[in-house]
Amino acid sequence: GVTLEIEVNVMPGKGNLVLTGKLGDVMKESAQTGISYIRSISGQYDVKPEFFQENDIHIHIPEGAVPKDGPSAGITMALAMLSAITNHPVRADIAMTGEITLRGRVLPIGGLKEKLLAAKNAGMHTVCVPKENEKDLSEISEEITEGMEILLVEHMDQVIKAAFV
């Protein structure tokens, strides 16, 4: 497991979602699901509905030569898009993993041990983990989780609350 940095730019355009960084199909679909969820809640953040027709959103995951795939970055991409759209900063010491649904539910992921180790090595103090992965935590040594706050999340609302500064 490695941590991925996710960059999002919003610019005037025609409502396109641009995805770069050698992303696989599942990861691209995850980004699409994330933007659909963000659009559905954008009114809560005073984002006008026409915003999404008048702007393009570009998601880039650096190290473009390295292939990336899977649904695990779904909540992270959704949060990054919401942050870029609302100009609301995200804490620098938080990592997260989880598949996102159209309704903002957070679904379980695989490889939790490796992901937590990568987060620890990257200096993260807090990690949002799907509640459905709680059973996997018992198999992970305290050496890895020591000094880290593990937040078990079921919905994007919890992720947003934990991550926004």
Predicted feature descriptions by range:
Residues V2-V165:
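Peripheral, non-AAA+ core regions of ATP-driven protein-machinery
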